[in-house]
Amino acid sequence: MKVAVTGTPGVGKTAACALVRSLPVRNVNDLAVEFGAVKGYDRRRRTKEVDVRRLARAVARLEGDMIIEGHFSHSLGVDLAIVLRCSPRVLAKRLEAKGWSAGKVRENVEAEAVDVILVEAVEGVPEVCEIDTTRRTPLGMARAIDAICRGEREKYPVGNVDWSREVLSWF
């Protein structure tokens, strides 16, 4: 089984996956480099441009169960997507603390507020769970990921995270 741990940048994917014990973890950016799927660099966004189709073909050839961690890992033909979610207000603070530009913070907070990655995962992955990371420690997130990978998915259904009240309070 290939499992994506995905979510908007800043929700805690990398910190959580560093503590996961149920399956080996591969980082989506490392896989892109390993399989020659990096096609350029977006200077404005300060990020690698990845040929997702090429990377998905390479991931399909990988053997064994694994977690693929990264904000577009749900686009790689995985069996299960675990979407990590975070309050847009908290996410903004996290990204600002990382020194991200105001534009990049806004872009990612808006994406989280309107469920961009969750919708993509639901549309393209056979099974999806979501975890609210707002008040969880990395260890707490890792334990939830491990539980989901062991089949304990009923606590983490799609739709259990809703930022609509928070978003409406912005107006």
What is each of the regions a protein language model found here?
Residues 123-171:
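NTP-dependent small-molecule kinase module
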Residues 66, 81-83, 128-130:
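Short, well-ordered beta-strand core segments
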Residues 11:
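ATP-binding Walker
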Residues 26-76, 162-170:
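ATP-dependent small-molecule kinase phosphotransfer cores
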Residues 14:
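Walker A/P-loop
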